[in-house]
């Protein structure tokens, strides 16, 4: 069974994370890249939805157990490969010539929330799940690129509160501050609304992709030029 599945619903590509808490490690990053590449290779695809198979978690963020194991075994190349591969996932979402929609059907912690912020739009169910950045409590700073694209998705005043407090925020509050498009009643309603929204798009890839390239040019520059300053020496912990 794949940890990330790709399916088509008409012209909408649905990428489903299917590994429990969907903690992010090198295998996860490679699977996400492959799924996105395959989705975009299909010229009939007009939108992409990223969601989770589970009821409780969208993604619990970085696989800290895997990361500590890599550190303890001095497998630094794996750590670097993971971080660069996740940056590739983020850049593909930021530059995809079709809308990328996160259907957040459970907890989105840390890198899980960050992944959703790389998407163009977000929907989240209200009956279960929190959205938060616990990095301040686990002493793992954001990379510069992450800061840049999260700020496109979350108003500065709210991101300032969330990143410095680690506060857990539920869907209704996220909707109030325009971080998500809609707080949905449950998973069924979430997928119905996210898919209905995805189907409203049938834009030409050329102009849609060019708009995203121009919108996010500065973010891509930060990811490519500033992130390696922290990734190469693995200067990741505060």
Where are these regions (language model features)?
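Conserved CoA-thioester-binding segment of acyl-CoA-metabolizing enzymes
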Residues: 1-51
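C-terminal long alpha-helix characteristic of the crotonase
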Residues: 124-125, 175-226
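Hydrophobic/aromatic residues within transmembrane alpha-helices
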Residues: 50, 115-116, 174, 194
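CoA-thioester-processing core
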Residues: 109-161, 193
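Catalytic-core regions built around general acid/base machinery
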Residues: 35-38, 85-97
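Glycine-rich beta-to-alpha transition loops that act as phosphate-gripper elements at the mouths
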Residues: 103-109, 162-168
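Well-ordered beta-strand positions
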Residues: 121, 161, 165-167, 182
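Glycine- (often His-adjacent) and acidic-residue-rich active-site loop
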Residues: 5, 52-88
């Amino acid at each position: 069974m794949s940890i990330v599945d790709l399916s088509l619903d008409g012209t909408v590509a649905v990428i489903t994370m299917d590994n429990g808490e969907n903690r992010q490690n090198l295998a996860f990053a490679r699977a996400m890249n492959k799924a996105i590449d395959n989705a975009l290779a299909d010229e009939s695809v007009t939108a992409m939805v990223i969601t989770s198979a589970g009821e409780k978690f969208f993604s619990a963020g970085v696989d800290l157990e895997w990361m500590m194991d890599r550190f303890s075994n001095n497998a630094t190349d794996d750590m670097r490969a993971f971080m660069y591969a996740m940056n590739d996932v983020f850049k593909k979402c930021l530059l995809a010539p079709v809308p990328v929609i996160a259907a957040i059907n459970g907890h989105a912690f840390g890198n899980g929330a960050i992944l959703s912020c790389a998407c163009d739009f977000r929907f989240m169910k209200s009956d279960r799940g929190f959205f938060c950045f616990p990095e301040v409590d686990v002493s793992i700073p954001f990379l510069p690129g992450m800061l840049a694209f999260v700020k496109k998705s979350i108003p500065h005043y709210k991101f300032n509160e969330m990143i410095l407090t680690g506060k857990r925020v539920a869907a209704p509050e996220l909707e109030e501050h325009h971080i998500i498009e809609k707080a949905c009643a449950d998973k069924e309603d979430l997928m119905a609304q996210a898919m209905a929204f995805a189907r409203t798009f049938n834009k030409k890839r050329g102009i849609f992709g060019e708009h995203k390239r121009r919108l996010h040019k500065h973010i891509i520059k930060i990811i490519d030029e500033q992130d390696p300053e922290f990734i190469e020496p693995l200067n990741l912990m505060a």
